[in-house]
């Protein structure tokens, strides 16, 4: 009589190793998504400073011009050229550029001028919930219970930051118009996230970022040229121009690459929860850079957001599908 391991048991180490690689890749996607939204959150603060002396269309046009040049150089150095695109890919990239670049940038930068930062934060905090709902209706993605709980936690956390923090009672003329612009920006961000799931899987994150930046530049170009023709270039300081450079290299090149690196590896409902990092990042940086009040309720709100992300990405321990039983053979 002798014993030998069953076929399943002998392959178990390889199966576990493959599972570990998948988990590591997914965790890498989570880190990329969170980092991307933290950078985009900084754009709210930097954008408020930038548009004080440089018009929205001109600054945005310059931003995407610089970003496109950098991304094109990286794409040709690393991938040696453009990937093959289908008509569907081109359409999706154009829609993404219009909604998540052109529409989002214009509505956000103009919106914060007409409404309070508090109300802007309240509205942008609904992005994760909107993405989760749209992913269910448009992409037919099932919303798991833990994802729904995570979305609600994140939304509650960011709304707590904005509703009960300092300045929540401030009013601004034309606030309704500003709020409508912020809502349009939120819709653009949600569609931007969802459309990424429709691209061909062979297109790299770098290539997608390059195309989106190029198309975004083309959308802004005619309006940027119009503003450039009458702009007084002696008004902005070196610091003002550095805001444009930051927007180009970090908010566009780096954040786009990180976002596309992660968004194609997880469900839309899960990637949507990470957009809650955006307003949290904006609140923290507003306190550090703009010296706006940072209160205890902000810590509570941030804890809710982190808790929501944790609930969403945590994995249940799976039972061992390959028990340690051995087979006996003669």
UniProtKB/Swiss-Prot annotation:
Keyword Cell membrane found: yes
Organism lineage string: Bacteria, Bacillati, Bacillota, Bacilli, Bacillales
Covalent S-S links between cysteines: none
The protein, known as: Uncharacterized transporter YetK
A Pfam match: EamA
Residues forming coiled coils: none
Any single GO CC term annotated in Swiss-Prot or TrEMBL for this entry: plasma membrane
Subcellular location: Cell membrane
PANTHER family for this protein: MEMBRANE PROTEIN, OS03G0707200 PROTEIN-RELATED
Keyword annotations: Cell membrane, Membrane, Repeat, Transmembrane, Transmembrane helix, Transport
Bilayer-crossing regions: 27-47, 56-76, 90-110, 119-139, 147-167, 176-196, 206-226, 243-263, 270-290, 294-314
Bilayer disposition of the protein: Multi-pass membrane protein
Family: Belongs to the EamA transporter family.
Chief location category: membrane
Protein's organism: Bacillus subtilis (strain 168)
Residue stretches making up the EamA domain: 38-163, 187-314
